[in-house]
Amino acid sequence: MQYRQLLKITMTFVVTLTLFLIPSYNHKTNATTPVPKFTRHAYEGNSLLLYPQVSGINIKAASKINSTLKGAAEKSYDNYIKLKKSEKDIPRKKLCKKTNNKCRYSYNSHYEVKYNSNGKLSIIYYDYAYTGGSKGKGSATMYNFDLMTGKHYKIHDILKTSCNYKKVQKYAFDYLSKHEPFSKSVSKLGDVTVNKNTQFSFAKDGIYLVYQENEFQSYTDGYPFIKIPKSVYK
């Protein structure tokens, strides 16, 4: 009887100790894959100049990311100030009577989270300026980060050799030249630019190449995102 009680106590201790020593899977997952929280801000209180800030991750990483994102907003603000100064130089008495739209300049910026998974973050930042006429001029800038370290990635961090650039360019060309509406303006390899200035976004199992509006003349539906599987450049 005493032997059975002793055996039961021993087994209970072993099970308890085992459960204590084995780490929680969920805890490990959360520790290795940060999940950021986003807050929206208006630069200098201007509701037309929006930018994000992140929290809920490593403080040093968040500080690096937030500094870069706020820097993007500062550039937009500088462009906004330049545009408003240009607006003041308009010969209003002559020009505004004929075409009132040409006297109403505007500038705005906003952002969108394109990828937030596996410890990587991609945010696209849009700028739009209107200086009269039928439409304004827009641009898009990608910001890619490591959520653990705050590292700001450029495409040369992904495509590390000239061979990788050529492989990606060839893959993008093969796709674009065979799919409308891109195929109408992509007929040779040189029509597809892939270099150290090319923008990208992280994606599941690869990246997206990101181009500006009208960079491919036959594509008029915003900013082209071209998927490149990781197998192409790894």
Residue ranges of each PLM-predicted region?
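Compositionally biased intrinsically disordered regions enriched in Thr/Gly
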Residues: 2-7, 25-234
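Bacterial N-terminal signal peptides
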Residues: 12-21
